[in-house]
């Protein structure tokens, strides 16, 4: 019984334990023995009834439990399915939310980083805008200064134009003066020529007079000699006459003792008388000749005195003319010196104004280039800022749309979860009502479940404390050269310059007040004799003069016909060595093949001096500045042309050869057609190295534009107005074999 009861008890307990239901309390046995049997019988009966009832109840309970377990299993399955679906949905939602959260977190982090970058950019933009404001203020100040400078330049240009007009007027006046001076000089030259002609005539007359004086002196000397001879002859005649008188006296004395000889002496006396008469005649002739000679001498002396007076007058006139011409020449030289000094001052002023204008144009070009660079940079920065702001706006709009979608999805998911939670609450309440009568035992812990998915990345932790200052690193490589900064403030006034050139001569002042009369000075030296007066009236005709002297010997007559050749004479002694003769005629011409001219020795690279070689070309880098057309003409005169750059190697070599901070013309222009750049030989560009934003044809109504190209710093190309002054580079082919000039 006990065993059966225990088995039943075990079965019931097993069945109850199976469903987690605890057993009920057992019946107490009667202690009385008499009642034991009854109780045992009743117990058997009750046990049988109980077994039957328990079996029936168990069956019913089992059926109900089966139904309940089936319903619970179905409900559990449904709930499991729902829970799995909910879990899958939650997982999906979790994955989606995780992905979306990750994406949103990444997007938010990117958005935050973008916002931080935008804030940083906005800060930089604000700083740049503040700097740009400062720079704009500086630019405005510089623009105002430029406007003031331009107004000053306009004023200076107007003053310079006025000065140039005045200079032109003065130059025209000086041209008039110069023409007048040229006319005066031509007149003076004519006068000088006439004076020279008259001077030559006077010199000829003087030479003739000198010749006549020499001839007269020779005649006078001859006359004096003849007079001396005549005087000697007269003395001789006188001596002879005295001797004759003495002889006559002796003859008278001796007449007594000569009477005897009278007859013999009569003939002698007749002869002597004839001789005496002849002597008397000769003496009378000599006296007449002497008187004629004295008259001629008087005439000659008067003529010589007149000639001397005329010579003195001519010398005085010549001296006066020379003094006048010297005074005029000194005045003209002084005037020319004044004109030269004025012209030098004018030329210096013009050169200074031209240099000042060139410096102004170069400064304006530099300011223009810097302004264009800054404006292009500002425009690029503004365009980039506008693009970034537009991108930020688009990103913010897309993020807002994504946030709205996420909010709507979250709202729908939360609503679904709230509905599912309400259903779960209802199911839990039903389960609670069903399992109120059962005591649920806590079972043993189940097996360990599979490893879950990796959780989401947590939010970043708080920023840590600032670390210690690290060691000083090594100095980095030097950075690239920064942009050119703004123009600094005006410096202090410089030192006083050197003394300028002498100014123009001032205008003549007003006439001063007359001074007090001074004391009477001493009498001066007598002046030079005045010029001779006019010729007087012709005097009365004088008596006929004496017979003139014998004239000079005439020129030799025409030689007669040549006679027959005589016999050859004996050879004479060798004569004295004569002086060296004149140089003989030039010899025969040297053949052209042997005649060479020295040429400038070229360098070993095949280029002339001051030319540089690269590959098969020669290049000339100018040291002076010139206009584009003048530079082109200069290169053409040197049998070359402005440089054509067709390769990068050539560009790099030219860049290395350039002098810093100097611009150079190249043979590139768009004068024929705008914005179609061609080399001077008409070919199109094969290689380009324009600066960023160039060519821009920067004119803006201020001129014809920029139609000529050149090299600036770092060898980049830029367009310039053709009227600018720049250095230039000439190019020509290298001469491999220099022919010898024959």
Curated annotation (Swiss-Prot):
Question: Where in the numbering of this chain does the C-type lectin domain appear?
Answer: 614-731
| Extracellular topological segments | 59-742
Primary subcellular site in the record, as a coarse category: membrane
What residues bear carbohydrate chains?
67, 159, 168, 271
Q: List the disulfide bonds.
A: 607-618, 635-730, 708-722
Q: How does it sit in the membrane?
A: Single-pass type II membrane protein
Q: Indicate which residues the UniProt annotation says bind Ca(2+) 3.
A: 694, 696, 706, 718-719
Which segments does the entry list as coiled coil?
A: 73-141, 215-254, 296-328
- What domain of life? Eukaryota
Drop me one GO molecular function for this one: carbohydrate binding
* The protein's name in its UniProt record: Collectin-12
Which classification does the entry list for the species? Eukaryota, Metazoa, Chordata, Craniata, Vertebrata
- Please name the gene that encodes this protein: COLEC12
């Amino acid at each position: 019984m006990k065993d059966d009861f225990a088995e039943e008890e075990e079965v019931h307990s097993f069945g109850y334990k199976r469903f987690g239901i605890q057993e009920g309390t057992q019946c107490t046995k009667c202690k009385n023995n008499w009642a034991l049997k009854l109780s045992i019988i009743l117990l058997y009966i009750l046990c049988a009834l109980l077994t039957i009832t328990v079996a029936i109840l168990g069956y019913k309970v089992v059926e109900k439990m089966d139904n309940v377990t089936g319903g619970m299993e179905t409900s559990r399955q449904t709930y499991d399915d729902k829970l799995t679906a909910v879990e899958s949905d939650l997982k999906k939602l979790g994955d989606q939310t995780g992905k979306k959260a990750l994406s949103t977190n990444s997007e938010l982090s990117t958005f935050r980083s973008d916002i931080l970058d935008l804030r940083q950019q906005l800060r930089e933009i604000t700083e740049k805008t503040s700097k740009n404001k400062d720079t704009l203020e500086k630019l405005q100040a510089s623009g105002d200064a430029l406007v003031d400078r331009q107004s000053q330049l306009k004023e200076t240009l107007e003053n310079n134009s006025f000065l140039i007009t005045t200079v032109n007027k003065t130059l025209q006046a000086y041209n008039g003066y110069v023409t007048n001076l040229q006319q005066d000089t031509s007149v003076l030259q004519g006068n000088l020529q006439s004076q020279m002609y008259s001077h030559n005539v006077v010199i000829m007359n003087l030479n003739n007079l000198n010749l006549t004086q020499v001839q007269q002196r020779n005649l006078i000397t001859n006359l004096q000699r003849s007079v001396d001879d005549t005087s000697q002859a007269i003395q001789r005649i006188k001596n002879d006459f005295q001797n004759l008188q003495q002889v006559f006296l002796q003859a008278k004395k001796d007449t007594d003792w000569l009477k005897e000889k009278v007859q013999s002496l009569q003939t002698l006396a007749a002869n002597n008388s004839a001789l005496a008469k002849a002597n008397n005649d000769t003496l009378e002739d000599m006296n007449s000749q002497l008187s004629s000679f004295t008259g001629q001498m008087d005439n000659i002396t008067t003529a010589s005195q007149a000639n001397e007076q005329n010579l003195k007058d001519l010398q005085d006139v010549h001296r006066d003319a020379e003094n006048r011409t010297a005074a005029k020449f000194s005045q003209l030289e002084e005037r020319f010196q004044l004109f030269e000094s004025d012209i030098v001052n004018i030329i210096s002023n013009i050169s200074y104004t031209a240099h000042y204008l060139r410096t102004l144009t170069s400064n304006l070009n530099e300011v223009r280039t810097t302004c264009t660079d800054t404006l292009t940079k500002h425009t690029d920065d503004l365009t980039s800022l506008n693009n970034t702001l537009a991108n930020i706006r688009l990103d913010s709009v897309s993020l807002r749309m994504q946030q709205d979608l996420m909010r709507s999805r979250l709202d729908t998911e939360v609503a679904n979860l709230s509905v599912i939670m309400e259903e779960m609450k209802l199911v839990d309440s039903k389960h609670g009502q069903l399992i109120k009568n059962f005591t649920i035992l806590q079972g043993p812990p189940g097996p360990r479940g599979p490893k879950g998915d990796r959780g989401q990345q947590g939010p970043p932790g708080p920023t840590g404390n600032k670390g210690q200052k690290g060691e000083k690193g090594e100095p980095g490589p030097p950075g690239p050269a920064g942009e050119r900064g703004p123009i600094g403030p005006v410096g202090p006034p410089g030192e006083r310059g050197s003394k300028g050139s002498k100014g123009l001569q001032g205008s003549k002042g007003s006439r001063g007040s007359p001074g007090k009369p001074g004391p009477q000075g001493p009498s001066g030296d007598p002046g030079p004799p005045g010029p001779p007066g006019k010729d007087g009236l012709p005097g009365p005709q004088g008596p006929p003069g004496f017979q003139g002297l014998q004239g000079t010997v005439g020129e030799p007559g025409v030689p007669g016909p040549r006679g027959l050749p005589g016999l050859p004479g004996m050879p004479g002694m060798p004569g004295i060595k004569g002086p060296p003769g004149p140089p003989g005629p030039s010899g025969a011409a040297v053949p052209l093949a042997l005649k060479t001219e020295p040429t400038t020795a070229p360098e070993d690279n095949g280029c002339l001096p001051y030319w540089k070689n690269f590959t098969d070309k020669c290049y000339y880098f100018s040291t002076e500045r010139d206009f584009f057309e003048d530079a082109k003409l200069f290169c053409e005169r040197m049998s070359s042309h402005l440089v054509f750059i067709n390769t990068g190697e050539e560009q790099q070599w030219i860049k290395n050869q350039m002098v810093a901070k100097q611009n150079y013309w190249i043979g590139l222009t768009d004068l024929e057609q705008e914005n179609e750049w061609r080399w001077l030989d008409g070919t199109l560009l094969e290689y380009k190295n324009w600066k960023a934003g160039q060519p821009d044809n920067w004119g803006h109504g201020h001129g014809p534009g920029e139609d000529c190209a050149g090299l600036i710093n770092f060898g980049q190309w830029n367009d310039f107005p053709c009227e600018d002054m720049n250095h230039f580079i000439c190019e020509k082919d290298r001469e491999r074999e220099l022919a010898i000039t024959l």
